[in-house]
Amino acid sequence: MNLGTLVSETRNPQTMDLDALSTPELVKRFNEQDTLVAEAVKATLPDVARAVDAAAAALKSGGRIIYMGAGTSGRLGVLDASECPPTFGVPHGLVVGLIAGGPGALLKAVEGAEDSQQAGEDDLVALNLQEQDLVVGLAASGRTPYVIGGLRYARQSGCTTVAVSCNPDSPIAREANIAISPVVGPEALTGSTRLKSGTAQKMVLNMISTGAMVKFGKVYQNLMVDMKATNVKLVDRACRMVVEATGIGREEAETLLKQTDFEVKPAILMALTGLDAAAAREKLAAHQGFLRAALEH
């Protein structure tokens, strides 16, 4: 493949003079390019919605969401995966981020790690890939061998696969059941896909993981009601969520949270129904953890 033909590798005619600009002009030029990202992502929303539904289906069937990529793309997957346990109270390992070259590549580039299709397959084998897992391949270029190898193995294993690329009709798109391709255009700095392409990928991952968790019962209204209150800031947030969801006072919210070990969902259910902590937990369990369903039935 001639990489110079990729949209993400071509020169941007709007930024040919970066080295001659004043600092205010320089950052304005970057910002002008960044405004294009949201519209590019908007054009992919039907495919993102399919990916959200696939991710939710994977979780409901006992599977995992597995991101895999190299360089910036891999780091973005690891970032999104690492935020899911504290935000949604899910176990570590339910959302997984794989980066070519292994964990060391998060901090320091591992040269050539992305060039092996076999490495992508091997990393999924090491995770004991199951057919109920969802595998999301991330590559701004859309042609990273590590990702191609992983997606190909995942499909052969019966998994649903998603490809996120910033070039149209990419090789990884052809390996996936669902292709998400926000075409953000040439980067302000030629070929530096940590810029617009990285931003677009982050926006897509935000929607996939958050949307899946909404459909997995981890959200009530727009509150992260399965959040783990593991520090002072989060204890305060837990109190505020109970107050905002129920209209009770803060002191009463704190009393209820102490009875639930600072679990927000049963505290809200207790406040709105009068149930005790044990009965609230039992009712939530009967509705697969969906707070709205527990309140309405």
UniProtKB/Swiss-Prot annotation:
Induction: Induced by MurNAc 6-phosphate that releases the repressor MurR from the DNA. Repressed by MurR in the absence of MurNAc 6-phosphate. Gene3D superfamilies: 1.10.8.1080, Glucose-6-phosphate isomerase like protein, domain 1. It is an enzyme of class 4 (lyase). The active site is at E83, E114. It catalyses: N-acetyl-D-muramate 6-phosphate + H2O = N-acetyl-D-glucosamine 6-phosphate + (R)-lactate. GO terms for biological process: 1,6-anhydro-N-acetyl-beta-muramic acid catabolic process; amino sugar catabolic process; N-acetylmuramic acid catabolic process; peptidoglycan turnover. PROSITE patterns: GCKR, SIS. GO terms for molecular function: carbohydrate derivative binding; carbon-oxygen lyase activity; ether hydrolase activity. Its EC number is 4.2.1.126. Keywords: Carbohydrate metabolism, Lyase. Pathway: Amino-sugar metabolism; 1,6-anhydro-N-acetylmuramate degradation; Amino-sugar metabolism; N-acetylmuramate degradation; Cell wall biogenesis; peptidoglycan recycling. Disulfide bonds: none annotated. It holds the Pfam family GKRP_SIS_N. Residues 55-218 form the SIS domain. InterPro entries: Etherase_MurQ, Glucokinase_regulatory_CS, MURQ/GCKR, SIS_dom, SIS_dom_sf. NCBIfam families: N-acetylmuramic acid 6-phosphate etherase, PRK05441.1, PRK12570.1. Homodimer. A lyase-type mechanism (elimination/hydration) is suggested for the cleavage of the lactyl ether bond of MurNAc 6-phosphate, with the formation of an alpha,beta-unsaturated aldehyde intermediate with (E)-stereochemistry, followed by the syn addition of water to give product. Belongs to the GCKR-like family. MurNAc-6-P etherase subfamily. Specifically catalyzes the cleavage of the D-lactyl ether substituent of MurNAc 6-phosphate, producing GlcNAc 6-phosphate and D-lactate. Together with AnmK, is also required for the utilization of anhydro-N-acetylmuramic acid (anhMurNAc) either imported from the medium or derived from its own cell wall murein, and thus plays a role in cell wall recycling. This is N-acetylmuramic acid 6-phosphate etherase. It comes from Salmonella typhi.
